[in-house]
Amino acid sequence: MVSIKSDREIELMRDAGKILAETHNAIADFIKPGISTYDIDKFAEKTVKKLGGECSFYHLYDFPGNFCISVNDEVIHGIPSKTKILREGDIIKIDGGVCYKGYQSDAARTHIVGKTSKEIEDLVARTKNSFFEALKVCVPGNHINDIGIAITNYINQFGYGIVEEYIGHGIGAKVHEDPEIPNYITKKKGPVLKKNMTLAIEPMINLGTLEVYTAEDEWTVKTCDGLPSSHYENTIVITDNEPQILSIV
């Protein structure tokens, strides 16, 4: 069941989103060649706590880290590791959640470590752009499937693979709530968008095939062709007019 949030609930989610956004900004400055994904995870945890929040992903479904940190062909759900060291040219996805006074925010960013090819730069930029294409249709009266249509129509012109096995979701007191939000076109329109619905929209775009698999650690999702993937996500709220992003500052 899709819940409609009160104004008070939305303000708490906005507070959670501010903490998460500031943490993402701090992580962007922290990333450099030679550090491990474990280093990033501990830095993220420390930053979230310093800002007054809690890391939502820690032990969520028994996930062992604070943030999901995925490198290169890893799409999502990468487990932070002391042995996974960043190198020049890596593409790293940071996906995290923050809980503040019982309410959640969820956002992901993709960073390039140092310099890389224009091909990878374009993938990262276009993944982010696809989120903002989706944001344009997040108005009352439209349907959930309009989000997938917007992402697909934008991404298909570049020939990338849109991950279908993992999707966006509603969010509120829980990280994952109804409705499910595919990043691709489905046969069903899905629920109607209404004022004060809160959604986590998160296109996951692969340079090559859309096909993915889960690694032996039972968490990390990787591309089947070994090519890089990019991920961009924000928590938003539907309003009477334009939607608002709750996870930026």
Give the predicted meaning of each segment:
Residues 1-249:
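Active-site neighborhoods and metal-handling regions in enzymes and metal-associated proteins
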